[in-house]
Amino acid sequence: MRPWGRCGNPCAFAKFHAVPRSQSAGLLLYRRSPHGLEVFLVHPGGPFWAKKDLGAWSIPKGEIEPDEDPLAAAQREFEEETGFQISGEFRPLAPLKQKSGKTVYAWAVEGDCDPSGLKSNTVSLEWPPHSGRQQEFPEVDRAAWFPLDEAKRKILPGQVGFIEWLERATR
């Protein structure tokens, strides 16, 4: 299964095909625990997501800047949203199309970090709507490690395929 056509390389594929703004990149960080594999997910901040849990979490990800290497974008976004720098062997996953039409490129990487050290960047938005008042909210308000079965319930439905890939690849 080579989702990238003949090149077999997601970075080359994305560069060759001029990545539009409707694409983002992220990292699926995983670790091995005594209870099996766990994945690191983040919960979006802000008032819209405050009371949402199941189907609301995500891999740390964000938009790819013009002329930016997709893997570099994934690493940058991970650090911006969590405060953590991740290194290791980045394994490309097949891109997934979200309900919004956005395509998400992702890489799986084994590693570890402590969610209690989360340091997210912030976003400004008008809140309450039509109030004319801008407020700052963390882009990510929390992070956690989840066993794969629980992660599949927590993560946005359009990203479940990343966890399913990890299950198959690590059997």
Description of each model-found segment:
Residues 148-171:
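Charged phosphate-binding loop/patch that engages nucleotide di/tri-phosphates or the phosphate backbone
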Residues 18-58, 107:
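N-terminal strand-loop-strand
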Residues 13-16:
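Aromatic (phenylalanine/tyrosine) cluster motif
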Residues 58-93, 147:
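The catalytic Nudix box helix
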